[in-house]
Swiss-Prot record:
UniProt-listed Pfam families: Trp_syntA
Known catalytic reactions: (1S,2R)-1-C-(indol-3-yl)glycerol 3-phosphate + L-serine = D-glyceraldehyde 3-phosphate + L-tryptophan + H2O
Gene name for this UniProt entry: trpA
Entry annotation: catalytic residues: E49 (proton acceptor), D60 (proton acceptor)
Species this protein is from: Polynucleobacter necessarius subsp. necessarius (strain STIR1)
UniProt KW Lipid metabolism keyword: no
Protein name: Tryptophan synthase alpha chain
One MF annotation (Gene Ontology) recorded for this entry: tryptophan synthase activity
InterPro entries per UniProt: Aldolase_TIM, RibuloseP-bd_barrel, Trp_synthase_alpha_AS, Trp_synthase_suA
Amino acid sequence: MSKITALFKELKATGKKGLIPFIAAGDPDPKQTVELMHALVRGGSSVIELGVPFSDPMADGPVIQRLSERALTHGVTLHSCLEMVKEFRKKDANTPVVLMGYANPVEQMGAERFATEAKAAGVDGVLVVDCPPEECVDFAARMRVAGIDPIFLLAPTSSQERIKGAAKIASGYIYYVSMRGVTGASHLNTQDVASIIPKIREETDIPIAVGFGISDAASAKAVSTSADAVVIGSQIIRLLEDAPSGQAVQSLETFIREIRDALDS
């Protein structure tokens, strides 16, 4: 059983929901990434999604595009992301870490080498944004052989066929994008989320995490009534952008604690 699967079983047994924050490796500073990861855990995160910066993040809105540009300016690569996970693992062997990014850096490294090095670094899951399930059957199989959960995106526009395809090859959890558009979009409709999630559950018992449009404790709590976990990304990036000098780590921990408390209430 993978670390992510075990975590969701434990959450279900205790009646809790998962909290999955997204931060980007190298933003706002590569030297701070591991410290921010530990702050996420102290705040009550269940899984950490660590973003691998890419020069053309097509699924991301302006907030995450800005962070990708900053991280790339700092020279962050897929290799340095793996080094950050390795450093994080020196103090935390338990919290699952999912790498989230685009196919190009993985293709440049090679899927086989990536799987080997990611597992050695302590990566538990991988979500390749531009890798739809019907095109990534072999990639998913390679990840599973290496002991890494392949995680896939589904959206309001996903056909039942695509839902079935993702259900067949995904493990860990499925990331349901709660609205059309790019990350950081607003106008979250929790009723729409609640109506579509049962269609996914018809095909799989894999936990479902919902992201896009979740920006505060209230929206996280509302989504959690139908989802197994909530994902928060753009709001965290905004918080880190706006945090006074020297206060980013504490601001992040406080924000995550507020979300965790709301989910547990």
